[in-house]
Regions:
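Catalytic loop of short-chain dehydrogenase/reductase
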Residues: 34-58, 64, 68-71, 84
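C-terminal helical subdomain
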Residues: 79-80, 95-135
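PG/GG-rich flexible active-site loop of Rossmann-like NAD(P)H-dependent oxidoreductases
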Residues: 40-43, 79-86, 129-131
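Amphipathic alpha-helical dimer-interface segment in Rossmann-like NAD(P)H-dependent oxidoreductases
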Residues: 13-33, 68
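Catalytic Tyr-X3-Lys loop
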Residues: 3-19, 36, 59
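Short-chain dehydrogenase/reductase
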Residues: 11, 15, 49-57, 99-100
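Short beta-loop-alpha junction of Rossmann-like oxidoreductase domains
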Residues: 48, 75, 79-93
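Conserved active-site helix of classical SDR/Rossmann-fold NAD(P)-dependent CH-OH oxidoreductases
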Residues: 16-19, 56-64, 68, 75, ...
Length: 135
C-alpha cells in the first residue's frame, strides 16, 4: 500500500486543487456559467486505480455536491470522465496503442458543455476508447 503522504499528494492534486479554484472563482460566475471538472473512469471503477482512483472517486463526489450547491445560482457543473487517453506523456513513455482516446475527443466533449442552453447541464459523461480502457 502507498504511504499516507502519497495519498495526500494525490488528493491535493486531483481534489483540493479543484476545490480551491472553485472557491476562489465561484463568486465571480454569473447565472448561465459552467464549471467543468475532469475526472477519470478510474473514479467510477472502484476495483482499480489505487490512490489515483480514490482521488477521482472523491472528485466525483465533490462534483455531485457542487452541482447541487450551484443549481440555485443557475451555474451548471459537469464532470467529464475520460478513459485511457493518448497524451504527450504517453507519447514520450512509449509508442502506445493508438486505440486510446485522442485529446481532441475530450476537447469536443468539454466544448459541448458550453454549447448547451442555460437551462441544460451535461451532468456527467464517461468517454472511453472504443476498445476499452487500458489498466
Amino acid at each position: 500500500q502507498p504511504e499516507p503522504e502519497e495519498l495526500q499528494a494525490m488528493l491535493d492534486s486531483n481534489v483540493t486543487a479543484y476545490y480551491r479554484l472553485v472557491k476562489e472563482f465561484l463568486p465571480l460566475l454569473a447565472p448561465g456559467s459552467r464549471i467543468v471538472l475532469i475526472g477519470s473512469t478510474s473514479g467510477i471503477r472502484r476495483d482499480r486505480g489505487g490512490i489515483y482512483g480514490i482521488s477521482k472517486w472523491a472528485l466525483r463526489s465533490y462534483a455531485y455536491a457542487l452541482r447541487e450547491e450551484c443549481k440555485p445560482m443557475g451555474i451548471g457543473v459537469s464532470l467529464i470522465n475520460p478513459g485511457g487517453t493518448f497524451t504527450e506523456t504517453r507519447k514520450k513513455s512509449s509508442e502506445e496503442d493508438r486505440s486510446l482516446l485522442e485529446t481532441s475527443d475530450l476537447g469536443k466533449v468539454i466544448a459541448l458543455t458550453f454549447r448547451l442552453s442555460p437551462q441544460a447541464v451535461l451532468e456527467e459523461v464517461n468517454i472511453r476508447p472504443l476498445k476499452g480502457d487500458t489498466y
